[in-house]
From Swiss-Prot:
The lineage of its organism: Eukaryota, Fungi, Dikarya, Basidiomycota, Agaricomycotina. Residues 1-11, 54-65 have a biased composition (Polar residues). Pfam families: MutS_I (PF01624), MutS_II (PF05188), MutS_III (PF05192), MutS_IV (PF05190), MutS_V (PF00488). This is DNA mismatch repair protein MSH3. Belongs to the DNA mismatch repair MutS family. MSH3 subfamily.
Amino acid sequence: MPSEGSQQPSLDSFFKRKNPRVEPYSRTGNNAIIDLTDSPPNKKIKLDDEGSQKNRSMTQTSSSYFKGHPTARPLSVDKRLPRKPSAAIQAYKLQDVIPPQPSHSGLAFETCSLVPQASFVPDSQPEPSASPAPQRTTEQLKRHEEWKTRILAMSGSFRRKRSLALDEAVAAEAREAAGLEDEGTPFDGSDGDDYKSESEKNAEEVGKQLKKYVAKELAGKGKSKGKKKEEIGPSGLAYTPLEKQFMEIKEQNRDVLLLMEVGYKYKFHGEDAKTASRELGIVAFPNRNFFTASIPTHRLHIHVKKLLSLGYKVGVITQTETAALKKIGDNRNAPFARKLTHLFTAATYVEDPSLSSSSSSSSSVRFDDPVVPGTAPPPTNALVAIVEQPVDRASDDRVKVGLVCVVPGTGDITWDEFDDSQIRTELETRLAHLSPAELLLPKQRLSKATEKVLTYFAGEPKHRGRNAVRIERIDNIPEYDAAFDFLTNFYHCKEHKATVSKGDVNDERHLMTEGNKQWSLQPKLSQDGADISLDEEIYLASGVSSSKAILTLVDFPKQVVISMAVAIRYMKRFGLENAFKHTSSFVRFANRSHMLLSSNTLANLEIYQNQTDGGLYGSLIWLLDHCKTRMGKRLLREWVGRPLLDVAALKARADAIEEIMENNSYHMEKLRSLLINMPDLVRGLTRVQYGKATPNELATLLITLVRLASEFKPNMGNVFRSCLLNNIPNTLPTILDTSQRFLNALNLKQARENDVANLWADPDRFPDIQDVKDCISVCEMELNEHLMELRKILKKPTLRYITVSGIEYLVEVPIRDTKIVPAQWMKISATRTVNRYHTPKILAITKERTQHLEKLSIVAREAFIAFQSEVAEYHELVVVSKQIAVIDCLMSLAQTAAASGYCKPKFVAEPELKILAGRHPMVEMLREESYVPFDIHFSKEEGTTKIITGPNMAGKSSTVRAMALIVCMAQIGSFVPAASVTLSVHDSVQTRMGASDEIGRGKSTFMVELSETSDILQTITPRSLVVLDELGRGTSTYDGIAIAYATLSHIAEIGCNTLFVTHYPTVAQDLAREKPDKISNWHMSFDEIQMPDGGAEITFLYQLTRGLQEASFGVWCARLAGLPKPILDTAQMRSSSLKAETQERLRGIVARRVGWMLHNLFDNKTSSSQVLRNVEMLHNSLSSSSISFSQ
């Protein structure tokens, strides 16, 4: 037996290190010495709980070898002072593993070293005398070897969870995090010996495990002197790596509401979590340093749309690596790599299917929700950039406004420049038509009047029946020269075939710089940094060169050029700048081919929404919309809001509608069948233009286009009478070859699965993909060859690789066979019956294979984007798709015209409007009672101004609205609800109806009336239709009469068709008497029956009848409204009294006038003809009132 205190040669070789390294270690409140000689071979040394009796008993429980060893003793702890090392390991202190560190209690840790230290002498013990090393028996040596095997394989402090190479990488990262200097590869022999004994190798492995454990503990606690001080959050805890990721991205996107992908959820943090909780109704709770709220991944797109509709800018941070790849990667101990890959606003959200969990699995991708006839048209989600310049530098009352509107979902672009008055009615009209979801405005602020209009427009979403409008303020609005240079560079730079993918939103390599040279467009770079050559072509539909596009820009007004530069610059951040590629899609808002309906007209006539709750139900678009496709709904909304001025175009639409109603031929039925299950081709092709379509989407588009193009044979000639209907059979076959060629390039099965890597039917189309696939095949072949070797090692001829939880190429070994598993295999996972391993060779090959797979993903994505760019060059696909939308609109109008009582309007050249048996189109659909028709005729012979009087609730406002709606419907090209309509083309329909204030804009009710009237007077022409309802009622009677009289007199002189509703009989009779050839009086008829109690029973007939009617029957309407009878009686008495007083005053006026006439007659101061004229005027006054000569 060896003597006490002697050293054991086997232990010496076991713990020996040739190139010692210093590794720090620190444990709070733990002053115990780690005595490895006392450690059991099959138990784990616990360092966390120094006071645990269980841990101390574990260190005393050991195999028979350690129990029988003379130096074996329990490990004790002195909590007051650090204890001294035992004599058995005086020469083996852990000085290089655990250096002295101050504890929280102010005591120093005792240190020891695994390397012999001849000069080490404890303070309290003399240096032991040298003695020969004890000799082990054969049984002891056997037990020792068994212990070495167990300590390398079993769980515990020295458990080898991964391969040695990967463990060393982790240790290196921990040392780097601890601030230690790397001295080279640890345990690297410095003696130059290539040969190492088995015991030396085992000793090195144990040392590595111990070193890794200590380094890991050090990195976890951060108590090293060289480690950076952890940043402490508001909770008093250090920021986690995930929180640091969020803070870093949030710092760069302060105005963005961020969602971060974490596992199977998307999480909000900080103030974003509170906002999400408030807006989405989800729970937000404090978690370490931030509030946190989360949503499941499959609900992401739903919540994103909700936040966008509320006006937020939303960013989605996604994980850029999978859990399976991370487990075998070099950064497996670091957090998942994440980037801001999606950025959206309400206007720039183009239904990205990658946000939908079902998009990749669905084989019938639809680009919008199913179309339900009669539902609201899809929102335009327009983005409007606005700039202005004062007309007079001394005042900003009148300004010149430049406006550019882009609809990213469809690629439609509208521009305009116009002068606007102090009340900004022109701007308000354009906003009402365009209905933007987002406004781009200068940060320096516009004029006060403009800001007031924009703020009012964006601030009342509920009143206007739409979502909130988001306002984005833009810095550094350029001057005209800088904006023109920017646009010139934009159209000179050819879009690279493989456009940079949406990837990292914060990567602004291709964005504009704002350095010394503002608004400069940097040329795009290839992956190797070389400049991509410029190209003159800019993908215009007609294939014109960029020089011609620049000439087009020269014709644009200056403010429009500035607005366009602002819009393009903003959309580049979202990857949507390609919307401006096709200048053929540019349309001016105000042009000579369309009627301009003002915002007041849109609201008063209920064109887009009703006035009750701002909804669709009861509006004109609700009545006319029976479209089967989303693109048809959008186009019909444009038709309804912008009636035509071209008689030929109007007749073409009406003729097409008539033929659809009458023609039931085979070709017509085939035309109807085209609309069945039709996806939104325009929106889908626009996504292709942006490079944002999925393979499934693109396949659906191409299949649909091929089906459409195959319906009609080429050169069929004119199969319909209508030229609009003939456009479809004539144009569809022209895209067959192009669509079929693109479709043949795809592997449809893989496209349905969104498999970009295996998408192409011809592998040689993109050789880079095949090259990477070949490299992957080589790796897989090597793995198969290695499998043969593993079968021999494990003696399992049927051994196969398995995949568990996304981890591939696992070698599964039953627990009973683990003894034959080589020590260098890395254990990945285990169950009760099997262990799963990766061999070093598998790790190396799979790592290389993973790199190739990542490269394949990048190359395949670039190839698919290049293919989308190639498809987008054929703009005729979009043109044909828009023709399908035209057919859908005509079919919808034909369905409306099929209702009974509709007629085809007749257009004439001379100014005229004649309506026979006209009806209100929406009222007759909403009410069960039949609508009482009306007749009206405007012409030079019949007069152009009709004054309408009559009782309240008699139908005056409904009748004049019906007349205006009939004109609008006729100039849309639709049939109209009347027996017969003959009209000339009206260039505008102007209305001023109702009474409401605009407190938000600082306008009273009367001020609103006058502002709207002023706008009408400035814009009407002899070919306008004007509707004025009770002008002047917002002020005193005398002022109201004066304003109504003067306004109507002025309009009558212009000669436009006018409907003037009033309760001022004086105005009506005076103007009708003064201008009988232009102005005539009409009223809504009624029956009045006297009741026995002295009251009257009124029956409204709702018929438009010639003549003036003074009675308004306001008390009767109050009775219908349910006012109490005492109030009604008092009101009736007061009304009678006021009427008597008025008649008395009139009799006095008549008496004085008669006296004056007689006096002049007897004095011969007045000619007989003048006397006759005075008598006639007096007679008219008396006949129009209730005063008689007898009174």
